[in-house]
A protein has these predicted regions:
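Single-pass alpha-helical transmembrane segments
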Residues: 257-273, 428-435, 516-524, 581-594
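Cytosolic juxtamembrane regulatory segments of membrane proteins
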Residues: 287-294, 451-466, 504-513, 542-551, ...
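Membrane-water interface at loop-to-transmembrane-helix junctions
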Residues: 303-322, 418-426, 457-484, 505-514, ...
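Soluble extramembrane domains flanking the early transmembrane region of eukaryotic membrane proteins
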Residues: 48-258
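Transmembrane-helix exit/juxtamembrane "anchor" motif
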Residues: 270-285, 434-453, 521-535, 592-610
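Cleavable N-terminal signal peptides of Sec/SRP-targeted secreted and luminal proteins
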Residues: 6-12, 32-50
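Hydrophobic alpha-helical transmembrane segments corresponding to the first two to three helices
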Residues: 244-409, 442, 446-447
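Membrane-lumen (extracellular) interface motif
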Residues: 325-361, 367-388, 398-427, 488-512, ...
Length: 615
């Protein structure tokens, strides 16, 4: 059955059910709290269980015990999305390849862990151990040479610790002794330096020895003896701190960004205080005193019968609020997992798994928010609002991922999702996501309350007088997006660098503070710009508050072009993945910030119109 027909049927079934719990949940005062509490606890518990799944080893070894080492992938250094399976290059390979059983998050992350011929045993040193003798043919030489030209690196995991190394090196013409052009050398020896504390592995380093190379400049069959060495050293670092080496933080950059954001907030607060104390407060005093002559000088008082008019495209409007609320809930859970230490750098697949699980479970929040708000204005049609909120973000996301997956399959990259993974994701979102979305919609409709409008809305809308360009939608979107963007641009750069480079964004507290600053700025600007809009008797503030709040995401996406131009990324695969996934991320921010902006404006508008005596 098509999905667009399945959701309304589920909604109708749940709405017509006569479960005893439904009667209890029809109490408006109880339903939101119970629903949010259940969803929150369930999402957090399941995220914890999926992210902290029991490992295959307890990371404790006796002397001589084999320590698991898996090879993962190879790829060009400057293109983090363009990775291929390790044995796509003609390395020494076992007779039988055994794929490590991976979680959903690891597969989504592009990890393809496989066994290798390396035999590393706990606290046993090895020197010049032969990995294999391999006769490289002309086409294999060409593949290695192409990889070296594109600065390919390899990635492995040793006791769940990541390690990297380069495949070879290029000796430019100026350094070549024969002066015949650049020389290409393949590293044939890898040295592992491992560190231990007691019976636990603490650290691993891999060095490709530049003194053990083979010239592969020409496509000539070459016999190569691949070797490796292992040296164990004691350290005092504790096991629980072994990931700290991947978490070096540049505090000066973060502090500069933080101070820049705080200064901007203080300036905006000062402007809003001046605006409200000098103008809005005086207006409220005049209205309270019943001074009709002075009342004629104020514009926003005259549109009290229009400001709470139901906006056009109500289905889409409520779907934006529902999806934005869901994404805000998802981000809150991600920060909670980061503070609990569940999400950390190089925790393979934990982030992707958490995203899938939390988004699926919080679909209840989307259905509830969309249906409850829509039902305040209409008794019918809320099912379509719930349906739209279910596809508003997932639809574009699935479309983008499908295109990117097709490109990855064409290139043979590890980013291509296996068919089994696609089936699992499809089942998750149909068997779990859709019923939860429908359930939230039913609860939201049944627990609806009357829309709290301080004044009665007239039947016909008041004509909006012409205004200057900077007071129209485009001007307010530019101002409402530029100021918050300027406050987060430094941290945004670090965020992009961690996604598309090799910078580790480890301070979740800094990222959390930046996100809170962004929310505060969006809310403050929304309130101020809404008041300015109302003073010129423009009562259509609903959609404008959404657009100017989400406009910050447009600046974020625009910065992607600048970031890409300054980076060393190249190739169609990396280009498509960079802009495709950034578009999905910025679209999510658009929905979240639009929701925040509207909610802030709604609270403000209700407050000022409650404070006046409406005739």
């Amino acid at each position: 059955m098509p999905l667009h027909l399945l959701i309304p049927l589920l909604l109708q079934h749940l709405r017509s059910s006569r479960l005893s719990i439904a009667a209890y949940m029809t109490q408006p005062s109880q339903t939101p709290r119970i629903l949010l509490l259940v969803v929150s606890l369930t999402s957090l518990c399941l995220s914890l269980s999926f992210s902290t799944a029991s490992p295959q080893t307890d990371h404790r070894y006796n002397v001589g015990d084999p320590v698991p080492l898996f090879v993962n992938k190879v790829g060009p250094l400057n293109n983090p999305s363009e990775t291929y399976e390790y044995f796509d290059l003609p390395f020494c390979r076992p007779d039988y390849l055994v794929k490590k059983k991976e979680s959903l998050g690891e597969v989504l992350n592009g990890d393809r862990l496989t066994n290798a011929l390396y035999d590393l045993k706990f606290r046993e040193d090895k020197t010049g151990e032969i990995l294999c003798h391999k006769e490289l043919k002309g086409d294999e030489i060409a593949r290695f040479r192409d990889a070296i030209t594109n600065e390919y690196y390899f990635q492995m995991y040793f006791d769940d610790l990541p390690l990297w190394g380069f495949i070879g090196k290029v000796e430019e013409e100026s350094w070549a002794l024969d002066g015949k052009g650049p020389k290409y050398y393949l590293f044939k020896h890898v040295q592992f330096n491992a560190f231990y504390n007691g019976n636990e592995v603490i650290e691993i380093r891999a060095f490709s020895d530049p003194n053990h190379v083979v010239d592969i400049t020409e496509d000539v069959e070459t016999n190569v003896k691949f070797t490796y060495s292992v040296f164990w050293n004691a350290t005092t670092t504790l096991f629980e701190n072994r990931m700290d080496k991947y978490s070096r933080v540049h505090w000066q950059i973060h502090w500069f960004s933080f101070i820049n954001s705080v200064v901007l907030i203080v300036l905006l607060m000062g402007l809003l205080i001046v605006l409200f104390m000098r103008h809005l407060k005086n207006d409220l005093i005049k209205f309270a005193s019943g001074d009709e002559e002075e009342d004629n000088e104020v514009g926003w008082k005259y549109i009290h019968s229009d400001v709470f008019r139901c906006p056009s495209q109500m289905l889409l409007f409520c779907a934006i609020l529902g999806t934005g609320t869901q994404l805000l809930t998802l981000v809150s859970f991600l920060f909670a997992l980061a503070f609990l230490g569940i999400l950390y750098p190089y925790s393979r697949g934990a982030l992707c798994t958490s995203l899938v699980v939390i988004y699926t479970l919080t679909s209840t929040v989307s259905g509830y928010s969309s249906a409850s708000f829509y039902s305040q204005f209409s008794e019918t049609g809320w099912e379509r609002s719930v349906l739209l909120s279910g596809v508003l973000y997932l639809g574009p996301l699935f479309f983008t991922v499908s295109i990117l997956n097709t490109i990855a399959i064409f290139y043979g990259a590890t980013a291509a999702l296996p068919f089994g993974t696609i089936v699992v994701i499809f089942l998750v979102f149909t068997v779990v996501n859709i019923p939860l979305l429908a359930f939230g919609g039913v609860i939201g409709h049944r627990s609806r309350s009357r829309f709290e409008a301080p004044s009665v809305t007239k039947k016909f809308p008041r004509e909006i007088p012409p205004s200057a360009w900077y007071r129209k939608t485009t001007g307010q979107m530019f101002l409402g997006g530029l100021l918050p963007f300027s406050a987060i641009i430094l941290e945004l750069h670090n965020f992009y660098a961690s996604l598309w480079g090799y910078k580790i964004f480890t301070l979740s507290s800094i990222l959390f503070v930046t996100f809170i600053i962004l929310i505060i700025l969006i809310a403050m600007l929304s309130v101020g710009l809404t008041y300015i809009q109302l003073t010129v008797e423009d009562h259509e503030w609903w959609w404008r508050s959404v657009l100017r709040g989400g406009s910050t995401a447009l600046f974020m996406f625009g910065y992607c072009f600048c970031f890409y131009a300054k980076s060393n990324m190249r190739g169609f695969l990396q280009l498509s993945f960079f802009f495709g996934y950034n578009a999905c991320i910025c679209y999510a921010f658009f929905l979240m910030l639009a929701t925040i902006s509207f909610r802030a404006s709604l609270v403000f508008v209700r407050h000022i119109y409650r404070a006046v005596k409406n005739e």
